[in-house]
């Protein structure tokens, strides 16, 4: 029985990142000021991405037919507790070219600049989500932007997509630039053909494109001297360190800090035959079970973290050939997660995420979320032997977030591209070239390198206790392998009671705001 299209899209993504009435902010309604058409699209060598040996059709006529409209700038003001923020928003795009100077893609970029700030001292932060295939709406409308959409546990697909002023906006202390990689948001190819897609829908092509967009924005806005930060969520944990490395070594741009939200840093620990994947997930699965009885903090999971590092791994390594060790492990995992002992023994205490989601509350026909295991939803096929369910913690957010992003862009920011807005584009993930080979994809190598290249670089890593897509303990295990000479006092890891989008919680969102602000002081 196949997954529904909606469930298939969500299940294929590694990120969560997600007709709205007129915004109820006190935005100052002004005439939009369009930028000169394609003013920044000169085909100089400095503005080219890595060479694409392309068979793409990239004629000027075709490029203009597919292109995004000129940039639009508007003025706004929002009243927040204890302060009012006046700012300038620009919605538009940056065009990318191949090594022949042929147009390849228009990358949608949304910028917010605080009015009256000195650009020499004012930080600027570039934000992107993951997927691959996710737009930046998750971070913009969920955590950092001047407006946000409530995405808490009460949200359902039909919830009104009404934005509100974001009291925890990062605009308090940094200008914001949200980037939608090609195929997400309104970003699109202006050339056709398989080669251009293969270039951008691949790890290295994606990294190169993101780095060039950031450099181009800095040049266009005369902000190369400003403090510069990057923030990425989920697969953004792969993008983030690699983009910083590209900026440092290929674009000639230094970066002051990197913020990683619920990141995946190393696929080796979360997939395939790696035994570490079971240790990485166990604390989050236990957190899901314990929160059913009351609030859970990371301190409450000290016992399971200790077990996951020690006896659990010892028994796991002994393998199923050691029946005593396997039974001992399975029974302990059953006690920690609440999964029936018979099921745990049948699976030898080795739960993958889908099995845990299905078995946790199977008697009542419910499944857990993947991005937030604490969110339970109905199993659409409880009578099936297979697992044919979506993600109750993410599926319900797609409609309201998409509608909110469209209305914000088209009505409030007055930028009106043709075509659909892609919040989560499953076709991007399906076509993505992860560069599979002997070495699975990871960014810890680049994390070490960027920390070594710049001894002043700061890194803030965050995660959610109930995140089953990017388990916090897996991140902890990766960070623990960093040499103290690189990580001490420079890499900070903060874990919140929440899921992948832990910032849906008011207290967590405020804490994230404060952590990022402290980092930029």
Where are these regions (language model features)?
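N-terminal cap/lid subdomain of alpha/beta-hydrolase-fold enzymes
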Residues: 39-60, 101-201, 480
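A catalytic-pocket lid/entrance helix-loop region that shapes and gates access to the active site
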Residues: 146-149, 244, 248-335
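Conserved acidic catalytic loop of the alpha/beta-hydrolase fold
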Residues: 208-226
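Alpha/beta-hydrolase fold nucleophile elbow
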Residues: 223-235
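Alpha/beta-hydrolase fold catalytic core
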Residues: 323-469
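Short alpha-helix in the alpha/beta-hydrolase fold that links the catalytic acid
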Residues: 457, 471-481
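Catalytic histidine neighborhood in serine/cysteine hydrolases
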Residues: 483-500
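Catalytic histidine-centered segment of alpha/beta-hydrolase-like enzymes
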Residues: 499-508
């Amino acid at each position: 029985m196949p997954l529904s299209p909606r469930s298939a899209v969500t299940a294929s993504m590694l990120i969560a990142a997600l007709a709205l009435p007129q915004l109820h902010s006190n935005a100052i309604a002004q005439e939009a000021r369009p930028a000169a058409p394609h003013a920044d699209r000169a085909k100089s060598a400095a503005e080219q991405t890595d060479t694409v040996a392309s068979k793409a059709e990239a004629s000027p006529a075709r490029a203009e037919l597919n292109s995004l409209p000129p940039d639009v700038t508007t003025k706004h003001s929002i009243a927040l507790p204890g302060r009012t923020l006046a700012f300038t928003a620009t919605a538009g795009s940056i065009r990318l070219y191949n090594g022949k100077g042929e147009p390849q893609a228009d990358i949608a970029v949304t910028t917010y600049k605080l009015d009256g700030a000195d650009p020499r001292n004012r930080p600027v932060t570039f934000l992107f989500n993951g997927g691959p295939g996710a737009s930046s709406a998750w971070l913009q409308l969920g955590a950092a932007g001047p407006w946000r959409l409530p995405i808490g546990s009460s949200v359902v697909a039909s919830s009104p997509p009404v934005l509100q002023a974001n009291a925890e906006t990062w605009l308090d202390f940094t200008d914001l630039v949200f980037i939608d990689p090609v195929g997400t948001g309104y970003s699109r190819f202006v050339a056709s053909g398989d080669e251009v897609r293969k270039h951008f829908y691949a790890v290295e092509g994606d990294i190169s494109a993101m780095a060039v967009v950031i450099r181009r924005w800095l040049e266009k806005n005369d902000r190369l001297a400003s403090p510069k930060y990057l923030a990425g969520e989920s697969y953004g944990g792969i993008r983030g360190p690699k983009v910083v490395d590209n900026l440092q070594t290929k674009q000639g741009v230094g970066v002051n800090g990197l913020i990683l939200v619920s990141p995946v840093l190393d696929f080796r620990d979360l997939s395939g035959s790696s035994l570490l994947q079971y240790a990485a997930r166990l604390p989050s699965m236990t957190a899901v079970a314990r929160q059913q009885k009351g609030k859970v903090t990371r301190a409450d999971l000290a016992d399971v973290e200790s077990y996951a590092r020690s006896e659990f791994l010892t028994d796991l390594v002994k393998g199923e050939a050691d029946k005593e060790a396997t039974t001992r492990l399975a029974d302990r995992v059953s006690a920690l997660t609440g999964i029936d002992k018979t099921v745990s023994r049948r699976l030898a205490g080795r739960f993958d995420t889908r099995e845990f989601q299905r078995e946790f509350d199977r008697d009542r026909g419910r499944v857990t979320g993947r991005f937030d295991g604490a969110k339970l939803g109905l199993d659409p096929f409880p009578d099936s032997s297979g697992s044919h369910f979506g993600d109750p913690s993410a599926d319900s957010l797609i409609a309201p977030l998409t509608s909110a992003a469209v209305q914000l862009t088209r009505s409030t920011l007055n930028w009106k591209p043709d075509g659909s807005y892609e919040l989560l584009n499953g076709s991007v993930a399906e076509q993505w070239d992860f560069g599979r080979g002997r070495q699975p994809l990871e960014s810890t190598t680049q994390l070490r390198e960027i920390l070594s290249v710049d001894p002043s670089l700061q890194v803030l890593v965050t995660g959610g206790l109930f995140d089953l897509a990017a388990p916090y303990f897996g991140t902890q295990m990766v960070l623990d392998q960093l040499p103290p000479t690189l990580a001490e006092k420079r890499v900070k890891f903060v874990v919140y009671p929440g899921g992948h989008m832990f910032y849906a919680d008011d207290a967590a969102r405020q804490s994230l705001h404060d952590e990022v602000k402290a980092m930029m002081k």
